[in-house]
Curated annotation (Swiss-Prot):
Example GO biological process: purine nucleobase catabolic process
One Gene Ontology term of the molecular function aspect: allantoinase activity
This protein's encoding gene: pyrC
Active site as annotated: D283
Sites where the protein binds Zn(2+) 1: H58, H60, D151, D283
Entry protein name: Dihydroorotase
Residues bound to substrate: H60, F61, R62, N92, N256, H287, P297, G298
Source domain of life: Bacteria
Pfam families reported in the protein's UniProt record: Amidohydro_1
Organism taxonomic ancestry: Bacteria, Bacillati, Bacillota, Clostridia, Eubacteriales
CC cofactor: Zn(2+)
Residues annotated to bind Zn(2+) 2: D151, H178, H215
Keywords in alphabetical order: Hydrolase, Metal-binding, Pyrimidine biosynthesis, Zinc
CC per GO annotation: cytoplasm
EC number: 3.5.2.3
Length: 398
């Protein structure tokens, strides 16, 4: 399989130049100002932006068990439309991803679909019971496991969480933390996030584990995590497009953690500009409109993530496309141990072609995802994905 990409403006975390890319057997084989090959498929980019495809550190595909909301196929196709070729899926499926059988189902289905790379998280505690860690022993020799997560139901017992972090460190896993204190989750969601953030940061320092703080949304939580990172703690920090693109004043849409105040958004953007944020994760969480009307928290995000982040960060706040590529591609690839996220010879040929000058209007009826739950309906942003390439194959084309 060969593909020649011509006339691209090539951008990744450290590069920005015009050139061509030759792909062979799924990897980048040659990069130059001009490349000519006979009898190969050619994609003419017409000087549009070509970046490493995005990798989502945080998504929910609802499969198995909740597939009226989303499934592995619809979620993967939505990812491709959004420019993503890799996702890390949370464990709150039905049954919960606490057993080899459930994890193998996801892997087998993903391989059968052959659309994107899917990393399935294991639940921190067995079936989210908050206390049992024995199931983690099943995965100690499974080198495909990259992360364990409590997203959906946090681990309230600090001793259990510390032990889980120690197990994660022993196995070179990332522990993904959904910081929400159950004592405050019904009364004050700001305190709920801040209190659990403080705890998990302290446990991360104590255990030495790599702890990934998911969907950080308050200025206080940011300050706590950044201080620990500066002290050398092995912590990575994730924010979402909706916590960048919305404030409570614009749309107090129900997500968890909630849409925050203007000053929180300003602090997130400031932290991005200072290089203190590691990844942007969508927290793609599809629900039916009926479920949303009854208060289910969450929103779809894969198909809108890039235009929101590009518009809010690059066009409005002066963040470079290089930095955005770092947040959406390079750092997520490093986090998940993937040979992707940059444009260099020998790297997997996962790429996205984008028209950054094209204005789009969010229309949920055009989503490939089964979910239509978005607070961005009717809003306009810049940046349209024209094509997504996975292992040298064009998997999505506008």
């Amino acid at each position: 399989m060969e593909l020649l990409i011509k006339n691209a403006r090539i951008i990744d975390a450290i590069q920005d130049f015009k050139g061509d890319i030759y792909i062979k057997d799924g990897v980048i084989n040659e990069i130059a100002k001009e490349i000519n090959k006979d009898n190969v498929e050619v994609l003419n980019c017409e000087e549009k932006i070509l970046m490493p495809a995005f990798i989502d550190t945080h998504a929910h595909f609802r499969d198995p068990g909740l597939t009226w909301k989303e499934d592995l196929e619809s979620g993967s196709k939505a990812a491709l439309k959004g420019g993503y070729t890799g996702v890390c899926l949370m464990a709150n499926t039905k049954p919960i991803c606490s057993s080899k059988e459930v994890v193998q189902y996801v892997r087998d289905k993903s391989k059968e679909l052959d659309l994107i790379d899917i990393h399935q998280c294991i639940s921190v505690t067995q079936n989210f019971d908050g206390k049992t860690l024995d199931h983690l022993n099943e995965f100690k020799d499974d080198n495909k496991v990259k992360a364990i997560s409590d997203d959906g139901v946090g681990v309230s017992n600090s001793n259990i969480m510390l032990e889980a972090m120690k197990i994660a460190k022993e196995n070179n896993w990332v522990l993904m933390s959904h910081a929400e204190s159950p004592e405050f989750s019904k009364s004050d969601m700001r305190i709920a996030e801040n209190m659990m953030t403080i705890r998990d940061v302290e446990l991360a320092k104590l255990s030495g584990a790599h702890v990934h703080m998911c969907h950080v949304s308050t200025k206080e939580a940011l300050k706590c995590i950044i201080a620990a990172k500066n002290e050398g703690a092995n912590i990575t920090l994730e924010v979402t497009p909706h916590h960048i693109g919305l404030t409570k004043e614009i749309n107090d849409y129900r997500v968890n953690p909630p849409i925050r105040e203007k000053e929180d958004v300003e602090e997130i953007i400031k932290a991005i500009k200072m290089g203190n944020i590691d990844t942007i994760g969508t927290d793609h969480a599809p629900h039916t409109l009926e479920e949303k009307s009854k208060g289910s928290p969450g929103m779809v995000g894969l198909e809108t993530a890039f235009p929101i982040c590009y518009t809010k960060l690059v066009r409005e706040n002066g963040v470079s496309l290089n930095e955005l590529s770092k947040l959406m591609s390079l750092n997520p690839a490093k986090l998940l141990g993937m040979n992707k996220g940059k444009i260099s010879i020998g790297v997997d040929a996962d790429l996205v072609l984008i028209d950054i000058d094209k204005k789009i209007k969010v229309d949920s009826n055009e989503f490939i995802s089964k979910g239509r739950n978005t607070p961005f309906e009717g809003m306009e942003y810049y940046g349209e994905v024209l094509a997504t390439i996975k292992s040298g194959k064009i998997k999505y084309k506008k």
